[in-house]
Curated annotation (Swiss-Prot):
InterPro entries, per the entry: BetA, FAD/NAD-bd_sf, GMC_OxRdtase, GMC_OxRdtase_N, GMC_OxRtase_C
Cofactor: FAD
Annotated GO biological process: glycine betaine biosynthetic process from choline
Source organism of the structure: Proteus mirabilis (strain HI4320)
Pfam families referenced in this protein's UniProt entry, alphabetically: GMC_oxred_C, GMC_oxred_N
Cross-referenced NCBIfam families: betA, PRK02106.1
Catalysed reactions, as listed in the record: choline + A = betaine aldehyde + AH2; betaine aldehyde + NAD(+) + H2O = glycine betaine + NADH + 2 H(+)
Name of the encoding gene: betA
Active-site residues from the entry: 473 (proton acceptor)
PANTHER family to which the protein is assigned, alphabetical: CHOLINE DEHYDROGENASE, MITOCHONDRIAL (PTHR11552:SF147), GLUCOSE-METHANOL-CHOLINE GMC OXIDOREDUCTASE (PTHR11552)
Protein name as it appears in the record: Oxygen-dependent choline dehydrogenase
Amino acid sequence: MVYDYIIIGAGSAGNVLATRLTEDPDVTVLLLEAGGPDYRFDFRTQMPAALAYPLQGRRYNWAYETEPEPHMNNRRMECGRGKGLGGSSLINGMCYIRGNAMDFDEWAKLPGLEDWNYLNCLPYFRKAETRDIGANDYHGDSGPVSVTTPKKGNNVLFHAMVEAGVQAGYPRTDDLNGYQQEGFGPMDRTVTPHGRRASTARGYLDQAKSRKNLTIETHATTDIIEFEGKKASGVRYFKGTNTTPQHVKARKEILLCAGAIASPQILQRSGVGPEDVLNEFDISPVHVLPGVGQNLQDHLEMYLQYECKQPVSLYPALKWYNQPKIGAEWLFKGTGIGASNQFEAGGFIRSSEKFAWPNIQFHFLPVAINYNGSNAVEVHGFQAHVGSMRSPSRGRIKITSRDPHQHPSILFNYMSTEQDWQEFRAAIRITREIMAQPALDPYRGEEISPGKDIQTDEQLDAFVRERAETAFHPCGSCKMGNDEMAVVDGAGRVHGIESLRVIDASIMPNIITGNLNATTIMIAEKMADKIKGIKPLPASQADYYVAGHSPARRN
């Protein structure tokens, strides 16, 4: 079969491209996805409060593991990635955070990326979004991604934690995606008005999947991209458990949207990557590109947990005998505890004036539990997820075999610089100062984790090594740019190759300040216009906050 475009990966970026490209009825698109459908009757992926469940299984999660991380007690750490229509937007925490304006302005300083500054990206964030309280200079009201804002009457602990951050001397902000990211405030979520997860499968593919010019193949594992010389011409993939490969051809382009872990793997297997990797697995080089799989970045975070003196936390919702009622309210009304991811407040701060924009992120949660649903504390409690935003540490991804079913070797090299340790120590100490504020006096009990005895630098470092976990934000492994380690240009085109683009979180040159999903969707929206060859949306004129010489904290 021949299509105009073949998209590899029906995730946060691939579904955007499939939807936008098939708006033209004369353009044919094949969308290949290694996972299955996003079953709408499966509460694990559709109920926001059930976000921990997909991470515990394998149906929707590739469940990669890292190599032993040398600075983290040689732990093999989780690296969950979404599998199925929606990709990681099918299993993520649904936090709608776009990053800081300065992240994009920094990207735009790199040669060839001049049009990736914030004011050129903002129109594409708006294009993708329908915010439940309407549009303004920063937000959209007619896009495929449903965004829900926290409502009055939500858990009192959210308000107390934001108030405590302000009492500790940090700014207050009413919109973490608006004029000013820096500060504490309410956190939006990608949830529909009916309380369902707003994955890109729901938001984008639902409007496109009935189009005759879009073909969606699930359980289709891409083996390699096929080339004629240096021109990408087709894809070889396996359908289900069938060991006979399928071959499809592209008239125009192949768009690789398999994510920060799988995109570099597919390139390497196809003969595009570092010479030593291609040689090791006896792969004929199509084009030697040393940056494929390099520059890997992520966010690391810790949980600081406290007992709650009043019975206001979500602890009762963890009890099996309360869950049928919560489930029924969500199923029939789309409301209640089940309709929220429970990350309804958070913030971004600078740990010192040496950072020009926030370097620490907080998510507040009114229960004490691990992100993947394990190790729930058997008392009323609450916690802050806290971690650094722009670690200088860099890792890598490389294939371990030519077999597409084999997981790659992943090394993030977490905490490999002195800056990492300084930021994490500061983050723990600042969090404790916030938790000690009067706003939390009615609620704050004993510190559960790390525990009040953990005070010295050495003790804090040991806690980080033993307990810090991924925030599930891998990116950067096929970075945009023009330098010798860049893999794609500012339009996602692979250097040295014709008719092949990479469009997903792997192309971010530097990780952003916050969760990655909204930005990955924005990147795909912006790239869709580049692929179509149409004029970009006009740059925004909106103001945005630059800290300048403002203190990081008022005394």
